[in-house]
Structures are given as C-alpha cells and as structure tokens.
Regions:
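Hydrophobic alpha-helical membrane-association signature
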Residues: 40-43, 91-94, 124, 197, ...
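Amphipathic alpha-helical segments at domain termini/boundaries
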Residues: 2-28, 32, 175-209, 217-229, ...
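Crotonase-fold acyl-CoA enzyme core
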Residues: 100-216, 243, 248, 253-256, ...
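Terminal peptide-recognition signature
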Residues: 25, 29, 44, 62, ...
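Conserved CoA-thioester-binding segment of acyl-CoA-metabolizing enzymes
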Residues: 1-65, 100
Length: 269
C-alpha cells in the first residue's frame, strides 16, 4: 500500500498575479504537469469564490506553470491505496464546483492553454469563456478509453463549442488532437506558438476588462443558458437584460463616450 503524500501548501499550488484589473491564476505543479490535486482544487475554489469581493478584478486568465496546462486529475498525490469511495465522492464534487465557479464567475475567464491539456485539465479550460491554446499542445478527453467517466461538465461545454458530431468524436473515440485542431474546430478561439499563448490571452482579457461589466455579465449569462430556452423565451430574456442595462450609469456613459468619440469609463453600475 502506498503511503499518502503530505499535503502541498495551498499557497504554492496556485499562483496569483493581479495587474491592471487582470487576475492571472497559474496552476503551479509543473513537476506533475499541473495535474489537479485536491489541494489545487481547494485553492481554485476559494480564489474563484473570492472574486465577488474583489471589484478591482475585471477579468481572469487561467494558465499552467511550465510546459503543460494540466494533464488531469492527480489522485496519486494522496496515495493510491488510501483512496476510498468517500474521498472520491468529495474530490468529484469539489472538481464540479470549481468548473461551475469558472462558468459562473462574475467576470470573464480566459484559458491560456500553454501546453498539454488532458481530462480534468481540459475540462477546466472548456469551462472558461475564451481559450487560447498552444498550436503544438496535445489535448484529450480519455475517460471512456480508461474505463472511467468525465465529470467536469464536458457533456455540455464541449458540444456548445464544437457541435454534437465533433463532441461525439472527441468523447467517444478519446483520441489525442492538437491545439491547431482545437482552434480549427472552434473548441479554442485562437492557436498560437506556446511562447505567445499567455500574452495573447492577456490581450483578450484586457479587451474584456474594457467592456461594460453589467452588459458583459448579462451576455455571458444568456449565452450559457440559451440552449435551455425556446426562441421566444430567449427573446424575452434578451429584452429583460436590455432593460436592466438601460437602468445603469454605464449605459449613459457608453452613449456619451460614443458621441464624444472617446473611450468609455465604465464602473459596473
């Protein structure tokens, strides 16, 4: 029986850097290609939950340290012989909560996939609003080939990006594909050389941070929930969102800035 490894200090498994309203979160387990341990999920959970109390953050970039983004779940960090059903259930629920926090974050999230992204690691990236991926990165959702199952929401996030036919190919055949393929299929927004991924992701985050926060939040919410509504319900939801935006100071600022031919200064209210 393998003895469980001592827990990693939470402050070390996730790095934070905030600059000009952009919060960069770096998965920091490069010795394991950023495989996601329970400690890393816990830190992500707490940090993402704190965004509602950090009004200065206007966008988030999520990336990985070293040569990989994340190669998936790291249950070995806890000792293979020590895993029981209770631990597995807690781990899965925690992973699902983190993916939902990314999808429902109060600010947009850009995944900077700087290298390989597999399984739970790719699930994290798919939960983001936008994705920039290294052209040469290898991506895979291998669960059905391993006799396990995906649990991070890809049955929704993947077909929402690439359509049902391509999602079936990716999930049922469990093949590796490249970052260049991901961009060609619409899974990622851009494919760049690995050295350019973080800078390109930050550029997207800066563009997002310059948008009107209330309008941006309404757009993200509606895009996420639109597949569950009828066309008439979507029109009604858009009308309600439009009315809410019209009540904000940013609505007035946007119109004034347009007429004055200057960049708008939005305050999120």
């Amino acid at each position: 029986m393998t003895s469980p490894a001592p827990p990693e200090p939470e402050a070390e498994v996730l790095l934070e850097h905030e600059e000009d309203g952009i919060l960069t979160l770096t998965l920091n387990r490069p010795h394991r290609l950023n495989a996601v341990s329970q400690e890393l999920y816990l830190r992500l959970d707490r940090t993402l939950a704190s965004l509602r109390r950090r009004p200065g953050v206007r966008a988030v970039v999520l990336t990985g340290a070293g040569r990989g983004f994340s190669v998936g779940a790291d249950l070995k960090a806890h000792g293979e012989g020590e895993l029981d059903d209770t631990f597995r259930a807690r781990y899965i629920l925690l992973a699902q909560r983190v993916n939902l926090r990314i999808q429902r974050a109060p600010v947009p999230v850009v995944a900077a996939v700087n290298g390989h992204a597999v399984g739970a690691g790719l699930e994290l990236a798919l939960s983001a609003d936008l994705m920039v991926v290294a052209e040469e990165a290898k991506l895979r959702l291998p669960e059905v080939a391993l006799g396990t199952f995906f649990g991070g929401g890809v049955s929704y996030t993947l077909p929402a990006r690439v359509g049902l036919a391509r999602a079936r190919e990716i999930l049922l055949l469990a093949r590796f594909f490249s970052g260049a393929d991901a961009a060609a299929w619409g899974l990622a927004n851009e494919a760049r050389p690995a050295a350019q991924v973080l800078a390109a992701s930050r550029e997207l985050a800066e563009e997002l941070a310059a948008m009107a926060p209330v309008s941006l939040r309404q757009a993200r919410d509606l895009l996420r929930s639109a597949p569950h509504r009828s066309p008439a319900e979507n029109l009604r939801a858009e009308g309600e969102a439009l009315f809410r935006c019209m009540q904000t100071e940013d609505w007035k600022e946007g119109i004034e800035a347009f007429h004055d031919r200057r960049p708008p200064r939005y305050h999120g209210r």
